[in-house]
Structure formats: structure tokens, C-alpha cells
């Protein structure tokens, strides 16, 4: 399947669009976003977002004691006449102090000074699932005893995440558990971008990096998080089913699972393993397999082993580029047949289209060395490799305009490094393969002993065998995540 030429497919660059929950309030939304840029005092901000002291301390105590019962918070009882002022938009903030270089701890301290120490959580000390179980559980316990202030705070709460894409995805994934537990509403999430790529942050208008003048920017960001509109975001479940006995070191976003399932009705080219291991997780932006993941894997290992070599964004990019060359991303076609390293040799791709229950086999072009399934408009620090496609090309290929909440993943391929480079500077679009509502990959070994994969920037090495296939199944999570729009 050939990608279009530049003139056929690419229009002027557009800001990614997301559907707003408040469809009738366009003027109201515009006004609120404009108000978010107005200078706001510390006192005004606190009045808008800070919880009453008795609830702040009760939530803290429940988390420390790992007990969500009302009794665990009884050390600070509500006032006899509970006339505590309910904040308009109560905020809870999660900070990854390892993000943002040396600024992470300072940003955490500034946040605590602005809205109270008890409303800012260090993710190295309090995990998001602990806050959800014990902190929100504490609020719900107060509300069940007739505390109207606690009830309103639980209903109005918003979350701010200060960190990179991985941190944001971690918090979103934990919040998604509230849907399964029928503990509604699920708080929407705002983003304070402290990571490297920050593609989630870019896609929802929070920017690609935090401003240099971060002290004043924090206050504006908190205010904007309390007034900006909310959008929906698809999330995607991934299940990897592999032969038992294979050893894999998965990223923290993948967890071991016993729920392995292989669709016997689907055409399988290899052999089904007699016994299996499984890993399961959720991603929000992209999953990829191939050379891009191999380069990312090498870079991440170097950064972990020798952090002093990757101490800033410029150094990171230089090292990343060096890995791209050393792994053969650029030079393979000069020294060998590029088809020998194409993913076609190890991978079979099946998809389901939107509103279809039938699997369809999709050919992988032999020149493609990386396949990416993309949910957002932003990949690789703000690039849009799928491109903004013209309507006639969309109709010709049977595609629809890509959105973050349309129930579809855009699948594209990258060839040798020069092709990837031109895609990344948006001179051309990637090699369009398909749009899919569900994906099944079958990978099998041979001359290749490992495949490299990554999910929202977290790479790993996936072992393969000659005898049995490994399967990767991707499907949409039924409940969408809620993200506050920053623009």
C-alpha cells in the first residue's frame, strides 16, 4: 500500500481537534480559557482549589495508614456544624520528582506552597492506586456519613500530573479502575509536562515542555487546570501471549496475567504453543515494533547505565541519533538487501475495522522496518507521521480523519532511517497501512531471536522462537479517559 505524495495528502498543518464534553458551550469554553491566562493571586487560587483542613488531613492519614475506613480518619473529625466552604474545583497533584531534570523536587515544593502540602503527592512515596483506594475511599466514607462538603469535593475533583507521558499514562490507568469498580465520576486529568517527548501533553494543549520561568507558570497552570474544558481520550489494552519458558523483562506498564487467549478461528501461520505466559497493559499514544523500538531500547539502557551521558535534551537527541546509525537504521540498504530486515519476515498483521467483527489480513510492505499503531496526532516529540490528509485521499483509501477519541488506531510503517527522518520533519507522511479498531500481530522467530517493541516510549526486548508463535492483541478499553484541554 503506497502512501500519497505530499501534494495528494498533506494540507496545511492543523491543531489536533478533540471532541469536547460541553458541546453547547463554545463561547463559555473560550471565555474560561482566556480567563486562565489572567494573573491570579495565591489567595484566589487557594480559595478555588484547596480542600478544607479536616478533609486534607483525613485523606493524608488514610493513605499513610492504608485504610479507607471512616475510623482511620477519625483523628480529625468534621466540624460539629459542617459549614466548611467547598472549593469550586478541588485539585489533587501528583509529581514525579525524577522528571524535569533537577527541577522536579523544586516544582513539588512550589506546588505544596501554593495549594497545601496535603494536596501534592510525590509518586515515589504515594502511588496513584494508593491515593485512589485510600484517599478517594476516605472522601467517599465521609460522604456516606452525610458530609455534603466531602460529597461535592469527590464529584468536582480534578487531577494534575506533573511528569512525562509514562507518568500521565500511569495515573490515567489507575483512574480507569474506578470505572470497573463503579466508583463514579472519574476525575479528569491535567498535565504539567516534565518529560522528554510529552506527546500526550502536546496533543491536549499543555505544551511540549514546561516554561523556563516555571515558578510563575505553575500558578497559571493550576488555575488553567481548574477552568479549562474536558475532552475524551481512547485507551488501548494490549495482551502479549508467548510460549512458556521465555524470559522477558517488561516495562512497568506491562503486568503478568493468566488471561491468555488465542482465537482459534483466525488464520495462524505458525504453531500455537502448548503452554503460554501472558503480559497485559494499557497504552494511550502508540505501540510499535521494529527498528524504532530497537533504537529506543539501546538509548534507554545507556541512559540507565550511564546517566551522566544523557543529562539534557540536546545530549539525549545526539545519543539517540547515534544509536539510530549504529543499529543500522540508516546504513542497511547500502550494505544489504533492506527486505532481509523487513518486518514482513517475522510478522503477520490482522485487523478489525470499526463496527466489524471480522478479522482482515493486511500485508506488511517488505521495505518496512518499523510498524507503529498511533492513537494521537503527536509522536516522537510532537511529530505527526500520519499527516493531515485531504478528504479525497481519505475516501480513496477508506480512511476517516484521525481523532484521539474515534475508536481507531492509525497503523503506519517506517522504512530506512532516511525515510523516517523525512517523516519526522514532516516533509512526507509515513507509509499508511491501515486504520483499525482491533489489531492482532503474530510474530515468529528464525534467524531473528528477538523483536523489539515499545509502548508509549517504554521499550523492551521480546524473545521469539522458531517453533512457536507469539501473539500481540490490541483492543480499545471500553471506558474512555478524561483529559483537561490546556489550549
Curated annotation (Swiss-Prot):
Protein name: Diacylglycerol kinase 4
Consequence of gene disruption: Reduced plant size with small and curly leaves. Reduced growth rate of pollen tubes and reduced number of seeds. No visible phenotype under normal growth conditions, but the double mutants dgk2 and dgk4 exhibit defective pollen growth and seed development because of non-viable male gametophyte.
Principal place of residence: endoplasmic reticulum
Family: Belongs to the eukaryotic diacylglycerol kinase family.
Localization per Swiss-Prot or TrEMBL: Endoplasmic reticulum; Cytoplasm, Cytosol
Superkingdom of this protein's organism: Eukaryota
Organism encoding this protein: Arabidopsis thaliana
Any matching Pfam family: DAGK_cat
Known tissue expression: Highly expressed in pollen grains. Expressed in roots, hypocotyls, leaf vasculature, developing anthers and stigmas, and receptacles of siliques.
Range of residues in the leader sequence: none
Function: Phosphorylates the second messenger diacylglycerol (DAG) to generate phosphatidic acid (PA), another important signaling molecule. PA is required for plant development and responses to abiotic stress and pathogen attack. May be involved in the accumulation of PA during cold stress. Involved in the regulation of PA and phosphatidylcholine biosynthesis in growing pollen tubes. Required for nitric oxide-dependent pollen tube growth and re-orientation responses.
